[in-house]
């Protein structure tokens, strides 16, 4: 027995020692929030470390802490005259260094030598001028939150005021607004909706976000009353930041899963100059299944994308970064060749869709003196959609063209902004953006699959311009009262329209635990350019459409119950006007779901109103667990050309989400299991009553538009699950992931269709379960 124990100890003790030897480096840069000036001598301490682990920043604001054990650590950063900041629950793994970029806010006091300690404010946005309806999200949350599927858009559906447009895609409905009102910005530049198969099911949504979460850093999501720097959005803004590649060593990630192959790499281009690269490439495994003839559904889906960022700091000329994203999509479906197999019209249609989308940008950042910071952008975005559909005759002998679409859009953007710290209490930001918009749009289509109606709808090409300017002032009126005021000017060349938009925000800290906030904004948004190009009788009938506009009012209350638990309530009212609609009918773009085949003459005749309350109870990650409970009650109504107030399509009434996650650590933190679950309950979308007898007679769905959106689909209840298991090796990490959306198989309600086999109009529903099993290695 003694011999046996000696053998076991001989084998086990080296493994234990090996585990204890695995450590990692945490590095970063600390700078002034307004001017981006590096803060020299700032103190960085690992909370609750014994003995104390910490360091100070050098002349470039950089710091490095080596030999940190695996697991999670919280950092406290302090600097005289600035508010201290806590960075909570930073994950330390064996494969990759942790590199942080940390901004500190100058304290609202001018007393020399005073150090102000701020609590953990994870719920606040990165943008210091966002007073209400804004929060930050991290790349780790997209991986951890159940239902996120590594996608920022799906992650956001867990936040208060947000619901999924449909489980089939990642579109989101924010406070009753159509998904088309959501804007995406990348590296400070507005970009086209970055989705694979964007707008195929719902405009503003797609299958999955175009860029991998391997390349994004902490980013902001705003849902109302935006600061003045944000324009061209009525619903929400994703302000996404890309990470900067590691400047000291090379690191790589490879992942294979049900949904795709993913490879990322980063590292120094020049260690001496601090330049670096970061890139990521993905290829859809669904495409591989099609190539191998494993996918038997008849729908062949392929997509791939590339993201990159090159960063070049200089000694005196500031920092230059070249970045870009691009994607290629293709989906093809063959019609069923036997008429007896047809259930709906889609079964007798051949469909092919190719999409090319990309953005490339050059950013320059430089400090100007001790109080100013200048950021400039030059970027080009482009999209190219090519769709063809053919309709099989009743006897399955002849295909007739149903639609031919070629849609190309391009945007050349030149932008610059100046942030100037007037004093420790006041910061001014001004900016100017000029965009040249290019378009080429050719569409011919039949109406309701009737070949004899096939005709040209649009054939137009040209360009126009969009010019925007803004000024935003942040002023600390007192230690407890912060004001943000701004003005934005917006000129759209196509309609020759100038819009002046005021913005305001007020945050009042009642005590260390309680605060009130108020926000107001006037906002505007042009339509997709193809809407302006629609022809009726050979005449472009929509070129004089004005900008759609809205007033946003938000009143918020925050209660920090503990340093990790907060309650937040926001009441809001939005009034919309000048939304395009059809004269004399209930039709309006406020309910728009798809826009590729839009062919109506429109006028700015629609008004809308959204109002409700959003509630959040959030327990931030700590002690190895977190939870998030959000609820919203709201109404969304509109009045179009028939002058009747009605429900909008997106007046779901309510949405409720509950998320929970727990981490389990084993083997001296070398192995980590995290389990995450989500349950969501949301009201169904609205739809119009169906004229049954007319629909059956014409073998297509005909809606009663005089009672538009008076009916509602059933309440949707679904659950999501995410399980990750990480193994930290000495120089690499392995991560096994199981993600499943709609794990209980709840049916989703899609639309109504005429069924050839039953001769009836039937509700189209599906049980859509989205699994993603993957293996990732970091090295």
Mark where each language-model region is.
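Transmembrane beta-barrel wall of Gram-negative outer-membrane proteins
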Residues: 257-283, 296-332, 352-376, 380, ...
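Outer membrane beta-barrel strand-and-loop segments of large Gram-negative receptors
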Residues: 407, 411-415, 457-468, 545-546, ...
């Amino acid at each position: 027995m003694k011999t046996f124990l000696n053998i076991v100890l001989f084998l086990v003790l080296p493994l234990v020692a090996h585990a204890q030897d695995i450590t990692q480096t945490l590095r970063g840069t600390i700078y002034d929030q307004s001017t981006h000036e590096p803060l020299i001598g700032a103190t960085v301490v690992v909370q609750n470390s014994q003995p104390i682990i910490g360091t100070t920043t050098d002349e470039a604001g950089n710091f490095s802490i080596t030999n940190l054990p695996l697991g999670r650590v919280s950092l406290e950063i302090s600097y005289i005259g600035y508010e201290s900041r806590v960075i909570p629950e930073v994950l330390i793994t064996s494969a990759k260094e942790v590199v942080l970029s940390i901004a500190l806010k100058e304290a609202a006091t001018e007393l020399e030598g005073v150090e102000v300690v701020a609590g953990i404010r994870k719920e606040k946005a990165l943008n210091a001028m966002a007073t209400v309806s804004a929060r930050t999200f991290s790349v780790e949350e997209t991986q951890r939150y159940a239902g996120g599927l590594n996608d920022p858009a799906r992650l956001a559906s867990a936040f208060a005021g947000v619901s999924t447009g449909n489980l089939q895609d990642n579109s989101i409905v924010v406070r009753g607004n159509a998904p088309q009102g959501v804007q995406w910005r990348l590296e400070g530049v507005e970009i086209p909706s970055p989705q694979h198969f964007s707008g195929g099911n719902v405009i503003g949504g797609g299958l999955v976000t175009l860029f991998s979460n391997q390349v994004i850093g902490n980013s902001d999501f705003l849902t109302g009353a935006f600061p003045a720097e944000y324009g061209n959005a009525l619903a929400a803004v994703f302000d996404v930041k890309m990470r900067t590649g590691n400047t000291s060593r090379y690191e790589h990630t490879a992942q294979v899963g049900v949904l795709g192959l993913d490879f990322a790499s980063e590292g120094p281009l020049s260690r001496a100059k601090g330049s670096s690269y970061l890139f990521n490439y993905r290829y859809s495994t669904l495409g591989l299944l099609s190539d191998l003839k494993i996918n038997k559904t008849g729908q062949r889906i392929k997509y791939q994308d590339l993201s990159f960022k090159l960063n070049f700091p200089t000694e005196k000329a500031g920092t230059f970064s070249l970045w870009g994203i691009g994607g290629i999509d293709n989906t093809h479906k063959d019609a069923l060749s036997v008429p007896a197999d047809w259930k709906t019209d889609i079964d007798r249609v051949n469909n092919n869709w190719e999409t090319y989308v990309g953005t490339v940008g050059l950013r320059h950042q430089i400090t100007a003196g001790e109080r100013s910071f200048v950021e400039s952008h030059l970027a080009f975005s482009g999209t190219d959609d090519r769709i063809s559909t053919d309709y099989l005759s009743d006897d399955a002998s002849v295909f007739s063209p149903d639609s031919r679409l070629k849609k190309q859009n391009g945007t050349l953007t030149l932008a610059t902004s100046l942030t100037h710290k007037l004093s420790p209490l006041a910061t001014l930001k001004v900016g100017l953006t000029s965009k040249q918009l290019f378009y080429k749009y050719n569409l011919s289509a039949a109406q309701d699959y009737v070949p004899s109606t096939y005709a040209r709808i649009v054939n137009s090409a040209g360009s126009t311009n969009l010019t925007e300017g803004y000024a935003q002032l942040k002023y600390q009126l007192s230690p407890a009262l912060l004001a943000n005021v701004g003005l934005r000017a917006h000129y759209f060349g196509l309609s020759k329209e100038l819009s002046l938009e005021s913005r305001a925000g007020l945050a009042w800290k009642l005590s260390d635990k309680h605060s009130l906030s108020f926000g107001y904004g006037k906002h505007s948004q042009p339509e997709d350019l193809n809407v302006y190009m629609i022809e009726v009788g050979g005449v472009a009938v929509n070129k004089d459409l004005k900008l759609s506009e809205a007033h946003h009012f938000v009143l918020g209350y925050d209660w920090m119950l503990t340093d990790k638990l907060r309650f937040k309530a926001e009441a809001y009212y939005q009034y919309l006007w000048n939304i395009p609609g059809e004269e004399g009918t209930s039709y309006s773009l406020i309910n728009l779901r798809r826009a590729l085949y839009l062919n109506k003459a429109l006028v700015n005749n629609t008004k809308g109103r959204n109002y409700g309350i959003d509630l959040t109870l959030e327990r931030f990650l700590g002690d190895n667990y977190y939870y998030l409970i959000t609820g919203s009650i709201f109404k969304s109504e509109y009045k179009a050309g028939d002058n009747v107030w009605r429900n909008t399509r997106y007046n779901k009434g309510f949405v409720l989400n509950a998320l929970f996650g727990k981490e389990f650590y084993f083997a001296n933190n070398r192995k980590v299991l995290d389990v995450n679950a989500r349950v969501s309950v949301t009201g169904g979308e609205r739809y119009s009553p169906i004229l049954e007898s007319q629909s059956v007679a014409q073998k297509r769905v005909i809606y009663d538009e005089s009672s538009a959106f008076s009916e509602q689909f059933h309440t949707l209840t679904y659950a999501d699950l995410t399980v990750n298991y990480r193994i930290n090796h000495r120089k690499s990490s392995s991560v096994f992931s199981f993600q499943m959306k709609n794990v209980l198989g709840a049916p989703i309600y899609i639309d109504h269709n005429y069924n050839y086999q039953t001769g009836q109009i039937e509700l189209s529903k599906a049980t859509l379960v989205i699994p993603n099993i993957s293996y990732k290695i970091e090295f």
